[in-house]
Design a protein with these regions (language model features):
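Conserved donor-binding/catalytic core segment of Leloir-type glycosyltransferases
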Residues: 222-249, 261
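Aromatic "clamp/platform" in nucleotide-sugar-dependent glycosyltransferases that forms part
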Residues: 311
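Short hydrophobic beta-strand element within catalytic cores of glycosyltransferases
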Residues: 328-331
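Conserved acidic donor-binding segment of nucleotide-sugar-dependent glycosyltransferases
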Residues: 343-353, 362-368
Length: 410
């Protein structure tokens, strides 16, 4: 990692309200081209801050074994300096890569010394966030911490059994608390997630700030789609419970001819493919895998209803993306998802394919005027998650200014 990582802060102050632009260093354990909520938010945050005139740097794992160092990378027309750490694939996971924990401080200290950032914003406490937070703390740099992490999601890929999982969870949250104590402010996407985090890290103050999305990037369809396409976007991982959706497909009225499109990749695809074949619905399930952004956006626009069967969502950015695309949402009644459903779809009992089928059918068979109201309600609800509100809130935190909790995912 080259020590000479400094670039000049822009002289333009118009985009920052006439105030001095900030030099922001974002530390993330997952970043583009990864496809998951934390990576999506980190990209949105970095791009949005750069568009406001701030100098933005990102530290993240490399996406392969050789691409490590400092690079100019372009995201949605904005060039960011990304400092890629040598990384290795987690053996039990389809795509997750991590830097060796004992190397992070050594490799990031020269970058921090060269940049002298005004603020460090960590996106997790796991590996990169933990190491960078400690280096920033040693130098007296302001630290903001955002938590997108549910230990239960990571433990799916470890050898811990059911008997040892509770112990592992306690250890994971104890470790999180040590890192977040270094932060001047701790945030998480929803009030429910904030309550969960406060309990887990011994009552430290936590602000609920929505990840937010740029709704202008999404295009709601005009009118009702001709077909009945159920859409999911995200990791094809065990905790997403996509098997419940496939089991619900044959329970839907045959006349609907409903199809299920999955945008995303993951290690559950072989098992889900086999399940679809076993149930005789393989011709109605499409696995698109990793796709370019424009394909994802088009799939959302052309969909009929979005489904989120996960029971471990701290906010669910992909559900927000669906709402910005004008889709009704059917989601599991778990964690933060109920906050996203209010006249724009339905909640179903987690893990219950019969209830899911009933709720999907209620949307797919709704009269045109009722279906249009659900679409309109999604578009209205997404206004509270405008990325510009989120950016302004984080700018205030970066400058050490008090902020009110929000906008959050209620």
């Amino acid at each position: 990692m080259p020590a000479d990582a400094r670039t000049e802060t822009t002289d333009t102050t118009a985009a920052t309200g006439g105030r001095r632009p900030l030099r922001v260093l974002i530390a993330a354990d997952t970043f583009a081209p990864d496809v998951n909520g934390a990576a999506t938010f980190t990209e949105e945050l970095a791009v949005g801050l750069a568009q406001r005139g701030h100098e933005v740097h990102v530290i993240a794992p490399s996406w392969n074994r050789t691409h490590h160092g400092s690079f100019d990378e372009e995201y949605r027309g904005v060039t960011l300096t990304v400092h890629r750490l040598a990384s290795y694939r987690w053996p039990a996971h389809a795509w997750y890569r991590f830097a060796w924990p004992w190397t992070v401080r050594k490799h990031t200290a020269p970058v921090i010394d060269a940049l002298q950032p005004d603020v460090v914003h960590i996106q997790s406490h796991i590996v990169v966030g933990r190491g960078v937070a400690r280096e920033a703390h040693d130098r007296g740099i302001r630290i903001i911490g955002t938590n997108h992490f549910m230990p239960e999601n990571l433990l799916e890929y470890t050898p811990f059994g059911k008997r040892t999982t509770p112990i592992a969870l306690k250890i994971a949250w104890r470790d999180a608390a040590k890192t977040y104590r270094l932060a001047e402010a701790i945030t998480t996407p929803t009030e429910l997630a904030a309550d969960y985090l406060r309990d887990a890290i011994a009552g430290q103050p936590v602000l609920a700030i929505s990840c937010g999305i740029d709704a202008t990037r999404y295009t709601p369809a005009t009118g009702r789609p001709a077909g009945n396409d159920i859409v999911f976007v995200g990791r094809v991982a065990p905790e997403k419970n996509l098997d419940v959706v496939i089991r619900a497909l044959p329970l839907l009225p045959a006349a609907l001819d409903a199809h299920f499109t999955i945008v995303g990749d993951g290690d559950m695809i072989p098992k889900l493919t086999a399940l679809a074949q076993e149930l005789g619905v393989e011709d109605r399930v499409r696995f698109l895998g990793f796709v370019p952004d424009e394909v994802k956006l088009r799939t959302l626009t052309e969909g009929t209803v979005f489904v989120m069967p996960s029971t471990a969502e701290l906010q669910s950015i992909s559900s927000l993306e669906a709402m910005a695309s004008g889709l009704p949402v059917v989601a599991a009644d778990a964690m933060a998802l109920p906050h996203l459903i209010d006249g724009n779809g339905a909640l179903f009992a987690p893990g219950d394919e019969h209830d899911l089928a009933a709720k999907l059918a209620s949307v797919l068979t709704a009269p045109d005027d009722e279906y249009a109201r659900m679409r309109a309600r999604s578009l209205t609800m997404i206004e509270a998650h405008d990325i510009n509100r989120t950016l302004s809130t984080f700018e205030a935190l970066y400058r050490g200014e008090p902020v009110a909790a929000g906008p959050e995912g209620r």
